[in-house]
């Protein structure tokens, strides 16, 4: 809302690998049903070039996770998603540098080691030989994303938010003018979502918005 206008709105994420080869995404983002946990693991897997099943997720534990800000208005997908992407890219750069291979190299996991393949070249990183740098993790990538904004000037012009949502909704209803009852016959929702990370979750979010809108309009006696 207006309280966020032109102020910092960052999220910080960490991805770590321990000596056993466990890959952990540390997320302070709160999933309240919108599917953030799945979406952020998708972002991490894409950034590192790994399968989603490789990741362990630690979330909602303030002793282990950095601040990711509040969960509202699809904020976590945009802001924390970018933070996870940066963390994954940071970790991948560290692995590539240790293995002394090219940027397109593939990362695989052996028994307590990383196997990095770059064409015919194969390098191994012994994880047990590395010292922990954060908790039990011997390799850690960090990403912080804060949407670029500018303060409003005296004329109210500027860029107070990093991105915006665009949508249109139409509802066809039936009204019993004698009883005063309303029946929703059909709702059409059109949303410009940009690049969809998880299309099924996006559709679920739209359905949820429709349900909330119907509730506010018909049942909550809301007076704006």
What residue ranges belong to the model's regions?
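Cofactor-binding beta-sheet edge motifs in enzyme active sites
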Residues: 1-224
């Amino acid at each position: 809302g207006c309280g966020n206008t032109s102020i910092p709105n960052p999220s910080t994420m960490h991805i770590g690998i321990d000596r056993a080869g466990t890959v952990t995404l540390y997320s302070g983002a709160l999933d309240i049903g919108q599917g953030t946990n799945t979406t952020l693991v998708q972002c991490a897997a894409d950034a590192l070039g790994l399968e989603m099943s490789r990741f362990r997720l630690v979330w909602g534990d303030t002793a282990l996770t950095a601040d990711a800000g509040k969960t509202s208005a699809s904020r976590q997908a945009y802001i924390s998603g970018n933070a996870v992407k940066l963390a994954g890219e940071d970790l991948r750069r560290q692995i590539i540098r240790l293995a002394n291979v090219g940027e397109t190299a593939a990362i695989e996991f052996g028994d307590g080691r990383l196997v990095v393949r770059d064409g015919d070249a194969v390098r191994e990183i012994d994880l047990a030989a590395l010292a922990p740098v954060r908790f039990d993790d011997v390799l850690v990538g960090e990403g912080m994303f804060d949407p670029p904004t500018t303060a409003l000037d005296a004329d109210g012009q500027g860029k107070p938010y990093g991105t915006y949502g665009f949508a249109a909704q139409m509802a066809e209803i039936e009204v019993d003018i004698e009883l005063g009852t309303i029946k929703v016959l059909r709702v059409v929702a059109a949303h410009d979502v940009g690049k969809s990370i998880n299309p099924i979750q996006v559709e679920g979010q739209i359905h949820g918005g429709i349900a909330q809108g119907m509730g506010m309009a018909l049942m909550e006696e809301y007076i704006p």
